[in-house]
Amino acid sequence: MSTVVHAQDPFGNAVTLQHPTSAAAVAGFVDGFLGYQPGILAILPAAETDHSLIVQTCAAVLWMFSESPAGPPKARWHLARAAAAAGPATERERQFAAAVAHWVAGDIGAALAQHEALAQQHPRDLAAIKLGQYHAFNLGDAPTMLRLALHAVPAAQHVASLHGLLAFGYEQCHRLGQAEAHARYALAMQPAEPWAQHALAHVMLTDGRLAEGAAFLQQASPQWRGLTSFMRGHNSWHLALFQIELGDDAAALRLYDDEVWGLDKSYSQDQVGAVSLLARLELAGVAVGERWDELATHLSCRTADQVQPFLDLQYLYGLARAGLPQADTLLANIQRFAPLAPAAARAAWQRVAVPAAHGLLAHARGMFKPAQADWPAAADALGAALPGLAGIGGSHAQRELFEQLHLDALQRAGRLAAVQNLLQPQANAQPQSLRVRRRLHAVYAGLGLPALAAG
C-alpha cells in the first residue's frame, strides 16, 4: 500500500500525496502558475514517482498548457495513472481533477462550471480560479473571469496574486478604475507581482497614458528576468506596444529580437506574440528585414493544431507573410475543423475564425507579393470577422492587431472615408500616439483635407 502524506498548498488547501517531497513540487506548481515562475516545472519529475491525484492532475495541466495536439494525450496518461493508483484524495482534489478531465476532453463549458463550483466552495484555491480564468479568457468571457476571482475576495483579500487576477478581470470588463486600484493594491503588497504589472499596463494603454505606461514597464522590466518565457516575453511585448505608439520603433524592434522572440521559440504564446509584434512594427512602417522568414520556420509545424482560434489565426498570418504554402494548409484545416469544434467555441471558429483567416491570408499575401494583392478582399473578410472577434479569445490589446490589419487593408483598398471614420476616434482617445497621428495624416492628405492633415 502506498504511503499517504497530508500536506497543504501555499494557500492552505489540503493536498494528499504519496511522498513528502511532493509537497514542494505542488507548492512550486501553485506558486509558479500564479507567479509565472519556472518552479512550475518541478511537478513533472515528482509525477514520475508520486501517483497521487493532485500531483498527476497538476502534471496533466502542465501538458495542456503546451497548447498543442501533443498535450491532451500526455494529460490523459497522467489522469489515467492517478485513476489506476486509486489513492485517497480530498473532495477539492477530485473536483479539480474533474475540471481538468473536462478540459482534456474538450468540454470547456463543463470545465468552467466545475471551476466556478470550486471557487465558491474553496475560495483559497487560487490555482483553480486562475485556471478557470484561463478558460474564460480563451472564450472571450470577461465577466466570468471577474466573477471567478471575486469569489475569492472574502477568503484571500490579502493575497497579492488574487488582486492581479481581479485587476485583469476588471480590465477585460472595461472597468479601468477598479482594475487599476486592484493592480496597485497588489503591487503595494508585492512590487514584482507580474500579472498585476501586466494588468496595469493594459489600463494605461487603454487610457492613452502611453508615456506613463512605457516608463512603468521599463522600470519594472529587470524584475522579469527570472520569470517564464511567456510572462517575460509578454510584458516585454506590452512595453514594445507603448514604444511603437510613441514612435520609438528602434527600441520596439530591439525588444522583439532580445525578449519577445529571443527566449523560447517553440512555445505557442511566444510564437503568436512574435507574429503580433512583427506585424505591428510593419504596420507602423518599420522595415523588419528577413525576420518573417526566420519566424515562419517555427510555425510550419502548427498547421494541424486547431487548439484555439486565436492561436491559429496568428500562425496563419506569420506563414502567409513569409510566403509559405503551409498557410493554405492551415486555412483548409481551420475550415475543416470549424464545424467540428467543441460546442463552447464552435461559433467563434465558424463565424469569426474562418472569415478572419481569409482576410489575414489576403493581407499577408498582399504584403508578400504587392503585385498580386487583393486589398478589398482582405478588408471585406476582416471586416466580417470583427464584430464577433472577442469570441476567439485573447485580450483587447492582442485582438487590436486584427483591427489594425483591417484598417490597413481599407486604406490600401482606397476606402479612405471608412478609415477616417474608424481612425479619428482612435486619435481622440490616444492623443499621445504618434503611430495613429502618422496614419491619420496620410488619410486626410488622401481625402483632400490638407488642413486636417496638418493638425
Give the predicted meaning of each segment.
Residues S2, P20-A23, G28-D50, A59-E93, ...:
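Inter-helical turn/loop elements of alpha-helical hairpins
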Residues H19-A25, H51-V55, A89-Q95, H122-I129, ...:
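Generic helix N-cap/helix-start motif at coil->alpha-helix transitions
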Residues D31-G32, L62, A101-H102, Y134-H135, ...:
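Residue-level signature for tetratricopeptide repeat
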Residues G35-P38, G71, D107, D141, ...:
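Residues in the short coil linking paired helices within alpha-helical repeat scaffolds
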Residues G39-I40, A75, A111, M145, ...:
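Single-residue signature of alpha-solenoid repeat helices
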Residues A46-A47, R81-A83, A117-L118, H151-A152, ...:
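Canonical positions in the second alpha-helix
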Residues A149-L246:
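Internal metal/ion-chelating core segments
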Residues L241-A453:
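Helix-coil-helix junctions within alpha-helical repeat/solenoid scaffolds
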